[in-house]
């Protein structure tokens, strides 16, 4: 298990040229992390996890590609980030990986309380939003999951990632309206030796 403080930029997801949750184009941000530096072996397979909490600051000088687009809401202030990533490699299906990611951002002005778990570690709270928060706070939840299969002899992998940018109220809401504000990535990656 590793614990760290950093300001590096992060990439999260299997995509080679794009990512649904976090990509390394913007500058780094101040954050702390707790996670595994190598897979933890269990009888059912290997598990890796990473918990990240930090602050994001908007860069006001960067504009949109389309000049007619405007910022909506409070995007120019500082926001808290809470992120949880868990990866599983089953012992019975070698070279196959399943990963679940969950991230929250909330404006620093709307900090729900002074407890660390309510803003930096909010990603550890229950999945459905009516359990942990009302809908009045400007909290943004992003969830993604991906599967990838690695072909070691060919130095290649195939992957699929699916994510959405809205917290569900319950299991029924998740299953009936899972395409609301969703995105997906499908790809094949080949590394030339």
Regions found by a protein language model. Name each.
Residues 15-20, 59-68, 110-117, 170-176:
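Outer-membrane beta-barrel translocator domains and adjoining extracellular loop/strand segments
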Residues 7-11, 53-59, 102-106, 151, ...:
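Transmembrane beta-strands of outer-membrane beta-barrel pores
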Residues 132-184:
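Long, repeat-rich segments with strong aromatic
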């Amino acid at each position: 298990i590793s614990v760290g403080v950093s300001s590096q930029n992060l990439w999260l997801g299997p995509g080679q040229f794009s990512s649904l949750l976090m990509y390394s184009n913007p500058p780094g941000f101040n954050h702390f992390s707790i996670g595994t530096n190598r897979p933890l072996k269990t009888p059912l397979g290997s598990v890796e996890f990473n918990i990240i909490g930090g602050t994001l600051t908007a860069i006001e000088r960067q504009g949109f590609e389309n000049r007619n687009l405007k910022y909506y809401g409070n995007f120019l202030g500082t926001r808290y980030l809470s992120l949880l990533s868990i990866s599983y490699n089953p012992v019975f299906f070698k070279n196959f990986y399943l990963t679940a990611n969950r991230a929250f951002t909330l404006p620093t002005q709307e900090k729900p309380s002074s407890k660390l778990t309510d803003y930096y570690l909010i990603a550890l709270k229950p999945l459905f939003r009516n359990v942990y928060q009302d809908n009045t706070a400007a909290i943004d939840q992003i969830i993604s999951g991906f599967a990838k299969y690695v072909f070691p002899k060919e130095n290649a992998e195939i992957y699929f990632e699916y994510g959405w940018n809205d917290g569900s109220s319950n299991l029924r809401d998740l299953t009936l309206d899972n395409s609301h504000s969703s995105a997906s990535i499908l790809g094949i990656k080949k590394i030339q030796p």
